Amino acid sequence: MKSLVLILPLFAVLTGIGFVSCGSNGGEKAGKSSIRRATSDATWLKNATQVTWLPRQVSGRYDGASALDNIRQASAGHAVKRSSYGTAPGGYVRLDPRMLRAMKILVKEGFTFRVTAIAGASHSRTSRHYAGLAFDVDFINGQKVGYVNPHWKRFLARCRELGATETLGPGDRAHSTHTHAAWPR
């Protein structure tokens, strides 16, 4: 029996059998190096004066899953909290390192912005927010996002260049006052 206990873990490693924690979104490849990189970029972003983080949901709720809560949780190396109201599923998810890296590059290239949602809030049922792959912004370069803001189109174009495959803003349904950028699953 003792030999079986010793052999099973070795067998699991050799055959590639893995275990997924309940906090995983199932699609992420959260190796140690990607978690370290995401933690480092989240810390950098949390401390960057060019980015502000909404401390509550746009709906007004304080549920521990605001953009500010999410960036603090990610910078501490943790999975971040998702809201559990409306269509939000609750639970936790790790933020995607590609998205965090893109946000960092946007700052380094001179954009200032306010993040209103990452994994929290209530979105469409299949929203990539719930997978830690999307963020919303309502101010860019000191101006409210809207048709008259001259910066939002360039901001979203740069997000696409940095890997976002879903970008929404003024002119798209339910996005007249904010931008949405999401990375692939």
Language-model features, listed with the residues they occupy:
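Bacterial N-terminal signal peptides
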Residues: 7-16
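Positively charged n-region of N-terminal signal peptides that target proteins for export
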Residues: 1-4
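Short, compositionally biased low-complexity segments
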Residues: 68-80
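Helical scaffold of the NTase/Pol beta-like nucleotidyltransferase catalytic core
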Residues: 77-109
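Active-site-adjacent loop/helix surface patches within enzyme catalytic domains
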Residues: 100-129
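Catalytic cores and adjacent binding grooves of peptidoglycan-active enzymes
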Residues: 31-43, 48, 52, 56-71, ...
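Bacterial lipoprotein signal-peptidase II cleavage site
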Residues: 24-28
